Design a protein with these regions (language model features):
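N-terminal binding-site loop/beta-alpha segment at the start of enzyme catalytic domains
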Residues: 1-80
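Active-site mouth loops of central-metabolism enzymes
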Residues: 22-34, 99-115, 141-143
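Acidic (Asp/Glu)-rich catalytic clusters
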Residues: 8, 70-76, 123-126, 179-183
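Active-site groove signature of glycoside hydrolases
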Residues: 122-141
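Beta/alpha (TIM)-barrel catalytic core signal, keyed to glycine-rich beta->alpha loops juxtaposed to Asp/Glu
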Residues: 3, 138-327
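Structural preference for beta-strand elements that scaffold enzyme active sites
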Residues: 13-17, 50-51, 78-82, 129-132, ...
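Short, acidic/polar
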Residues: 31-44, 110-124, 172-178
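N-terminal small/glycine-rich loop or linker at the start of catalytic domains
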Residues: 9-28, 82-104, 134
Length: 327
């Protein structure tokens, strides 16, 4: 299993990581069996999924708490652990983010808030260091929280050994350059799938130039690319899928027609459509890290199957042609 770099940090991991947003539960994901979630994280590490990603906002600390419980039973050296900072509900700030389960959440990328976030996360995660620290959402007005202050705080945490690599999520090319100007940026985490490819044109050229890695979240496009969604599948009122452009009738039909063309490949590689999509997604961008969510051991096993797929060059070209045809 080939490892790939996380920017210039010196950290290397397999391409597939485990996302733990769903483990946070709450109104977005519904109730969780935390004991199953702990087993899911243990299973991930056993299957060679080393990168475990979480965030304080996931379930308003609940995801971090569950990941921390799992870490009590896992060799820390076998895990690349990432979390995030910059979303605040301990106190009000000038930048409103949104309301989550009745709690008003703000953005705060001040040095003070970042340091507090990290200390709190270290405690919940039962560790003395984070392998990657992401800023979760950037502030629209850097006059309130200067980017230089944000990056300097993260560089200080790195010098102290509390974090090993610096990441940023939900960025622009200019913001990537800003991080690199004031310090170091190792990785960005962005939405990317076979249907959502803005990263390739808007961010990838800058990342290549500056040696910044990319980690993709939502690679299965909220389940649309698993092969389990049909044109007749409906979602309850309030579901984000109802507003996702990929789920609208015309785009959904394109996606399902594309997946239908790959039935012979699932037989050839003895895999599910979801596993095939994950494997292809990892090849779309050289060195791409792919983050797949799971909250049960079975879901982890399903995702982990993608690690064993070695696509033939001709098959990868054929599939990419199909993807390009609907892009």
């Amino acid at each position: 299993m080939q490892n790939i770099n996380i920017g210039k940090s010196g950290i290397q991991v397999p391409f597939l990581g485990m996302g733990t947003w769903a483990i946070g539960g709450g109104s977005w994901w519904g109730d969780n069996d935390d004991s199953l979630s702990v087993k899911a994280i243990q299973t991930a590490v056993e299957q060679g999924i080393q990168w475990i990603d979480t965030a304080p906002i996931y379930g308003l600390y609940h995801s971090e708490t569950v990941v921390g419980e799992a870490m009590k039973h896992i060799d820390r050296d076998k895990v690349v652990l990432s979390t995030k900072c910059g979303l605040e509900w301990r106190h009000e700030t000038p930048v409103l983010h949104k309301v989550v389960d009745g709690t008003t959440v703000y953005r705060d990328l001040s040095a003070k808030s970042i340091i507090e976030d990290v200390e709190d996360s270290l405690r919940r995660l039962h560790t003395d260091h984070l392998d990657v620290l992401y800023t979760h959402w950037q502030t629209p007005d850097f006059g309130i929280y200067p980017l230089e202050e944000t990056v300097e705080a993260m560089m200080k945490l790195k010098e102290q050994g509390k974090i090993r690599a610096i990441g940023a999520s939900n960025v622009t090319a200019d913001i990537i350059r800003g991080y690199c100007k004031y310090g170091q940026l190792d990785v960005i985490q962005e939405k990317y799938s076979l249907l959502t490819r803005r990263v390739e044109k808007q961010l990838l050229p800058t990342c290549k130039e500056l040696g910044v890695s990319v980690q993709a979240y939502s690679p299965l496009e909220q389940g649309l690319l698993t092969g389990q969604v049909t044109m007749d599948t409906t979602y309850p009122e309030g579901s984000t899928r109802n507003s996702n452009p990929s789920f609208q009738p015309a785009r959904r039909a394109q996606a399902l027609d594309m997946l239908a063309k790959w039935g012979d490949l699932t037989e050839k590689y003895d895999c599910s459509l979801a596993q095939l999509v994950i494997a292809l997604t990892a090849r779309m961008i050289p060195g791409l890290h792919v983050l797949c969510g799971a909250r049960t051991p079975q879901q982890v096993m399903d995702n982990a199957g993608a690690l064993n797929i070695k696509l033939d060059g001709a098959d990868a070209v054929r599939m990419k042609w199909d993807v390009d045809a609907i892009s």
